[in-house]
Amino acid sequence: MSRRVILVTGTPCVGKTSVARLLASKLDALYVNLTELAVRENLISGKDEERDSIIVDENRMQHKIREIIEGCDQNDIVIDGHYAVSVVPKKFVTYVFVLRRDPVELRKFMEQCGFSGRKLWENLASEILDVCLVDALNVHGKEKVCELDVTGKSVEEVISEILDVLGGHKGCHVGVVDWLGKLESEGLLGEFLKI
């Protein structure tokens, strides 16, 4: 069996870490959380004070990820992070799972996690405007990118969908959600795009 490198990406608070950790456990895979790796290995080039977030040194991160993948004994590696497609060398990637969540539900999760002000609205806009999906498609194309609507689903339900794709029982699809159209039809677009 050849090694699979599986990226789990999406807007902050969409459920990446919960899904990626459980997926890695089910696959007996190596789990890599990019934010934790950046902090642990000091792969940080600065801090964005306004957004209260770290700025990752992408070149050093790419080098470290390459080392991890090439040195791994396990068949599967699950990598978790909203910028995973920017730092994991394309040649290693088997699948990119882009998790999507209805912005109305996502806003509640973000507020529960302490997001507010500009950080909240920028991340909601990112989800509405498909930023993580577009980034994944630009790097990997439709063949490797799987868009999953996780709205209202348990982690186990999402894992089941991913395992169906990995097992060849279900294909990858993009164009699954249209948050812009949904919010516009519900008269909520102006409330959510506040940048």
Tell me the role of every PLM-derived stretch.
Residues 8:
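Hydrophobic anchor at the beta1->P-loop junction of P-loop NTPases
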Residues 19, 23:
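Hydrophobic positions on the alpha1 helix immediately C-terminal to the Walker A/P-loop
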Residues 80-119:
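ATP-dependent NMP and nucleoside kinases share a basic, alpha-helical "lid"
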Residues 137-195:
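NTP-dependent small-molecule kinase module
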